[in-house]
Amino acid sequence: MAGAQESLVLAGVMHGHNDVVTAIATPIDNSPFIVSSSRDKSLLVWDLTNPVQNVGEGAGASEYGVPFRRLTGHSHFVQDVVLSSDGQFALSGSWDGELRLWDLSTGVTTRRFVGHDKDVLSVAFSVDNRQIVSASRDRTIKLWNTLGECKYTIGGDLGGGEGHNGWVSCVRFSPNTFQPTIVSGSWDRTVKVWNLTNCKLRCNLEGHGGYVNAVAVSPDGSLCASGGKDGVTLLWDLAEGKRLYSLDAGSIIHSLCFSPNRYWLCAATQDSIKIWDLESKHIVQDLKPEIPVSKNQMLYCTSLNWSADGSTLYAGYTDGTIRIYKISGFSYAG
């Protein structure tokens, strides 16, 4: 079976941010660009049309793409970024308490979303791009329209008693349009699944032994993965609201993402990037930076995302770099 030989190899490193890369957004049509957010208070739009394969000193240390536009306006760390499905707009959330919608053709902020009382930690677009959801340290989840109007607040003093009892660190829409759903993870150690039509709690998923940093929903909307402080990834059946199994990552999980076309789950941990085959439940690869790290310089991956075709994994690091890993070992027979 061709899949058995597939592995990820380092294709290049991109330099542009000068602080932690917090999130990476990739276009769904595989256009040759990505957008990254950082603690340097900016977002970068990267042009990937001409990967420069001049491998320098370190093995694989080539420049892969170039930053061609920096998006500035946030006054604090930019914690998350996502793209609209047409690839024309980026949506960011920042510790300045605001969301911003950016026109990527001009680099201009077209909307500011003001309403959270504290840092915004996570943002997401619905499949049809008509709804936006955000999560914050103010313990609320807010649902917005694209005009920047807050339509509903879950949690907090006004949002009913079903909300989280801690910072809401991550929020994602399920791609399943038949059962419109939001999934949220929190420092209260729970993952909550919300019915998008009435913003009511569908189920409360408990089992983590520490705060939840990351949630991811599988491409078909059937599975949810969550991870955080306890170093264990829990896999949940979203339709049934029950835990399926756990995968031990061994250290704090900062980011999770499903491959779009393989039955793989990737976790960015304090130690390495772990890639599990969900069929066998085994780790198929353990990616570590190729450079030696001194004890006082913690270098680890903080953000992950796949290209839409599943051929490229983008990984953002604490030192501001983005590493690009490519699938190699394709079987071209048939």
From Swiss-Prot:
Induction remarks: By auxin, abscisic acid (ABA) and jasmonic acid (JA).
InterPro entries associated with the record: G-protein_beta_WD-40_rep (IPR020472), RACK1-like (IPR045223), WD40/YVTN_repeat-like_dom_sf (IPR015943), WD40_repeat_CS (IPR019775), WD40_repeat_dom_sf (IPR036322), WD40_rpt (IPR001680)
GO cellular component entries: cytoplasm; cytosol; nucleus; plasma membrane; ribonucleoprotein complex; ribosome
GO biological process: defense response to fungus; negative regulation of translational frameshifting; positive regulation of respiratory burst; rescue of stalled ribosome; signal transduction
Ranges of the WD repeats in the UniProt entry: 16-47, 73-103, 115-145, 163-195, 207-237, 248-277, 296-326
GO molecular function terms listed in the Swiss-Prot or TrEMBL record: protein kinase C binding; ribosome binding; translation regulator activity
Distribution of this protein across tissues and organs: Widely expressed.
Pfam families, sorted: WD40
Swiss-Prot/TrEMBL keywords: Cell membrane, Cytoplasm, Membrane, Plant defense, Repeat, Ribonucleoprotein, Ribosomal protein, Transducer, WD repeat
Subcellular location(s) of the protein: Cytoplasm; Cell membrane
Chief location of this protein within or outside the cell: cytoplasm
Function: Component of the RACK1 regulatory proteins that functions in innate immunity by interacting with multiple proteins in the RAC1 immune complex. Acts as a positive regulator of reactive oxygen species (ROS) production and is required for resistance against rice blast (M.grisea) infection.
PANTHER family: RECEPTOR FOR ACTIVATED PROTEIN KINASE C RACK1 (PTHR19868)
Family as reported in the entry's similarity comment: Belongs to the WD repeat G protein beta family. Ribosomal protein RACK1 subfamily.
Subunit structure: Interacts with RAC1, RAC3, RAC6, RAR1, SGT1 and RBOHB. Homodimer and heterodimer with RACK1B.
Protein name as catalogued: Small ribosomal subunit protein RACK1z
